[in-house]
């Protein structure tokens, strides 16, 4: 679950303190005593890349839409009242940064910045170099501990007391940093590279799966098909809609296609730019972050197949801002006729699955990623 700090500046101070204290204390008190010059230079190179990528992740703007942006045809037209412009696909308004962010992944408290389209490569490189640096240090520290243990019968004056103290402190601390950053890196790679999704979009997929499991998703998708593709509505497609609504079991793959998943390699190119420059500290994505290439499933192959049309809906496919009949908050009042008289009944309230209130298995809401739900 995302961390929320009482004083935001701590988000920069804590990582900076850890990078400096672990990196330079380990070098001065431990590595200088036994490590070769070549390995020391490699270690300091990793430290430099950590600082540089962290600086770029903090100060590189994530990207925001121009005020004259116009959504493409067959895309949701979502207007941000605060930025006074339309949001491009995959964009959200960050409550902390007070701006719409292109391809918003999340607001990161440890950079005091949103992770978005323009600075995602810097964020990933920062995680990468932290993992490389802490892994290298873990190997060096383990080697030193093993050497001291093997020669434990040697006179104590052969070892500096400060070295033993810092070995005791820095070894578990470095291992903890390596573990936590590795978990975050794996999550980012799994979402963005292997599935093509931001953390917000992965959260959306979990929410859609819940709606589908409760049989609440399909009616919204069909209404959205009539809204986005009105020219494809005919008796044949309507009969398919009725048949689908009567079908008891439908998998999520039959209802939802995530349009931006192009495969791991193409996802990486779209996010990080040209492969030879992935580790170059100043490289970034090649496009503008306003429009994104979509996969083949997003193209209508058979206009007479409702299943194909549903998979071509823009993301998220269950948007209800334009609908009156199907919304997140429906009335509990029901009017029916009994023996020629109109009777008002109060229906049993259903469990609310509002997009702004829903929580995933990690206990995360849309607001936890930094999104301003009031303008969603």
UniProtKB/Swiss-Prot annotation:
Membrane-protein topology: Multi-pass membrane protein
Keywords assigned: Acyltransferase, Endoplasmic reticulum, Lipoprotein, Membrane, Palmitate, Transferase, Transmembrane, Transmembrane helix
List, from the UniProt record, the residues annotated as the active site of this protein. Answer: 108
Q: Which InterPro entries does the annotation name?
A: Palmitoyltrfase_DHHC (IPR001594), PFA4 (IPR033682), PFA4/ZDH16/20/ERF2-like (IPR039859)
List the EC numbers from the record: 2.3.1.225
Q: Which residues cross the membrane?
A: 12-32, 41-61, 123-143, 164-184
Specify where it is mainly localized. Answer: endoplasmic reticulum
Reported function: Mediates the reversible addition of palmitate to target proteins, thereby regulating their membrane association and biological function.
Q: Which PANTHER family match?
A: PALMITOYLTRANSFERASE ZDHHC16
Q: What is this protein called?
A: Palmitoyltransferase PFA4
Source species: Candida glabrata (strain ATCC 2001 / BCRC 20586 / JCM 3761 / NBRC 0622 / NRRL Y-65 / CBS 138) (Yeast)
């Amino acid at each position: 679950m995302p961390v929320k700090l009482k004083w935001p500046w701590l988000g920069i101070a804590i990582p900076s303190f850890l990078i400096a204290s672990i990196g330079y204390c380990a070098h001065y008190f431990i590595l200088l005593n036994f490590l070769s010059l070549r390995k020391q230079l490699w270690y300091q190179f990793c430290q430099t890349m950590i600082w540089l990528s962290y600086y770029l992740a903090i100060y590189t703007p994530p990207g925001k839409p121009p005020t004259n942006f116009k959504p493409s045809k067959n895309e949701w037209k979502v207007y941000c009242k605060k930025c006074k412009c339309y949001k491009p696909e995959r964009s959200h308004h960050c409550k902390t940064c007070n701006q719409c962010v292109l391809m918003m992944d999340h607001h990161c408290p440890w950079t005091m910045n949103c992770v978005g389209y323009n600075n995602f490569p810097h964020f990933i490189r920062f995680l990468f170099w932290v993992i490389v640096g802490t892994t290298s240090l873990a190997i060096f520290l383990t080697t030193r501990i093993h050497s001291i243990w093997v020669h434990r019968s040697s006179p104590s004056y052969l070892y500096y007391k400060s070295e033993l103290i810092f070995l005791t402190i820095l070894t578990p601390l470095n291992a903890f940093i390596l573990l936590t950053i590795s978990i975050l890196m794996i999550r980012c790679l799994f979402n963005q590279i292997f599935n093509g999704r931001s953390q917000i979009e992965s959260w959306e997929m979990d929410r859609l799966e819940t709606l589908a499991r409760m049989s609440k998703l399909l009616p919204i998708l069909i209404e959205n098909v009539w809204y986005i593709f009105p020219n494809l509505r005919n008796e044949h497609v309507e009969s398919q809609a009725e048949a689908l609504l009567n079908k008891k079991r439908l998998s999520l793959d039959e209802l939802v296609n995530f349009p931006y998943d192009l495969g791991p390699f193409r996802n990486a190119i779209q996010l990080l730019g040209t492969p030879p420059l992935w580790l170059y500290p100043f490289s970034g994505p090649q496009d503008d972050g306003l429009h994104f290439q979509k996969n083949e499933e997003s193209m209508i192959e058979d206009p007479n197949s409702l299943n194909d049309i549903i998979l071509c809906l823009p993301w998220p496919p269950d948007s209800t801002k334009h609908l009156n009949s199907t919304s997140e908050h429906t009335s509990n009042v029901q009017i029916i006729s009994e023996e020629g008289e109109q009777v008002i009944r109060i229906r049993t309230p259903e469990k609310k699955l509002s997009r702004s209130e829903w929580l995933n298995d990690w206990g995360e809401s849309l607001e936890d990623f930094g999104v301003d739900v009031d303008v969603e």
